[in-house]
Amino acid sequence: AFAGILADADITAALAACKAEGSFKHGEFFTKIGLKGKSAADIKKVFGIIDQDKSDFVEEDELKLFLQNFSAGARALTDAETATFLKAGDSDGDGKIGVDEFAAMVKG
């Protein structure tokens, strides 16, 4: 799904680094997968993949399964990790993350 945007080796390394429950840190993950240095267009493409229901927002249930976008066998985020991730990205407080909020969070 991320071919041409992100390298498989970077994704594998990033997933390995947050395998343990409670170890997911979005900033570190975005850096490890190489997303931080990507263009706005590429970040928007990644957002489109994560936005599974195509609502133009990433909601809490999609964040919980965030890692599974990168590997089907990846773990779900814990409730605490999901809440922290949502809070970090949801700058307008509407309970979901839009594409501009996502881009701002990635660039961090």
From Swiss-Prot:
Residues at which Ca(2+) 2 binds: D90, D92, D94, K96, E101
Residues reported in the UniProt entry to bind Ca(2+) 1: D51, D53, S55, F57, E59, E62
Role played: In muscle, parvalbumin is thought to be involved in relaxation after contraction. It binds two calcium ions.
Note: Is regarded as an important allergen. On the 2D-gel the determined pI of this protein is: 4.53, its MW is: 11.30 kDa.
A GO cellular component entry from the record: cytoplasm
An example Gene Ontology molecular-function term: calcium ion binding
Family statement: Belongs to the parvalbumin family.
Organism: Merluccius merluccius (European hake)
PANTHER family associated with the record: PARVALBUMIN, PARVALBUMIN ALPHA
Keywords, comma-separated and alphabetical: Acetylation, Allergen, Calcium, Metal-binding, Muscle protein, Repeat
Pfam families the UniProt entry points to: EF-hand_7
Lineage of producing organism: Eukaryota, Metazoa, Chordata, Craniata, Vertebrata
Domain EF-hand: 38-73, 77-108
Record protein name field: Parvalbumin beta 2
N-acetylalanine modified-residue sites: A1
InterPro entries: EF-hand-dom_pair, EF_Hand_1_Ca_BS, EF_hand_dom, Parvalbumin
